[in-house]
UniProtKB/Swiss-Prot annotation:
Similarity comment: family membership: Belongs to the bacterial ribosomal protein bL19 family.
Lineage of the organism: Bacteria, Pseudomonadati, Pseudomonadota, Gammaproteobacteria, Enterobacterales
Keyword Ribonucleoprotein: yes
Stored InterPro entries: Ribosomal_bL19, Ribosomal_bL19_CS, Ribosomal_bL19_sf, Translation_prot_SH3-like_sf
Listed GO biological process terms: translation
Gene that this polypeptide is encoded by: rplS
Biological role stated in the UniProt entry: This protein is located at the 30S-50S ribosomal subunit interface and may play a role in the structure and function of the aminoacyl-tRNA binding site.
Protein name: Large ribosomal subunit protein bL19
Length: 115
C-alpha cells in the first residue's frame, strides 16, 4: 500500500525547484485569485526555515513590509506556487533563523555566501 502512495506522491512533486537554504533571499511567485481574475503575486524575502517532508515540504519566508515583519509559509510542491527564484545566497550557521524575528536594522543583515 505504501508503495502506491509513494508513487502517486512522486508524480505530484515538482522537478524545477531550485536548491536554496536558510539565509537565502528568494522571490516566490504565487497565483492569487481575486474575484474572477487570476494573477501572479511576488513575495521576496529571507528563507528562515525549511521543512523537508517529500511532497509535504514547506519553507518560511520573512520580509519587512512598511516597517512590519511579514512571514509566509509556502508548500514547496503546491500548484499555487508558480516559481521560486534565488536572488542572493546567505551565509548562516543555523537551520532555523527564528532569531531574526527579534532583530531589526543592521543586526538583521545576513552575510552573502561566496561559493
Amino acid at each position: 500500500m505504501s508503495n502506491i502512495i509513494k508513487q502517486i506522491e512522486d508524480e505530484q512533486m515538482k522537478q524545477d525547484v531550485p536548491a536554496f537554504r536558510p539565509g537565502d533571499t528568494v522571490e516566490v511567485k504565487v497565483w492569487v485569485v481575486e474575484g474572477s481574475k487570476k494573477r501572479l503575486q511576488a513575495f521576496e524575502g529571507v528563507v528562515i526555515a525549511i521543512r523537508n517532508r517529500g511532497l509535504h515540504s514547506a519553507f518560511t519566508v520573512r520580509k519587512i513590509s512598511n516597517g512590519e515583519g511579514v512571514e509566509r509559509v509556502f508548500q514547496t510542491h503546491s500548484p499555487v506556487v508558480d516559481s521560486i527564484a534565488v536572488k542572493r545566497r546567505g551565509a548562516v550557521r543555523k537551520a532555523k533563523l527564528y532569531y531574526l524575528r527579534e532583530r531589526t536594522g543592521k543586526s538583521a543583515r545576513i552575510k552573502e555566501r561566496l561559493n
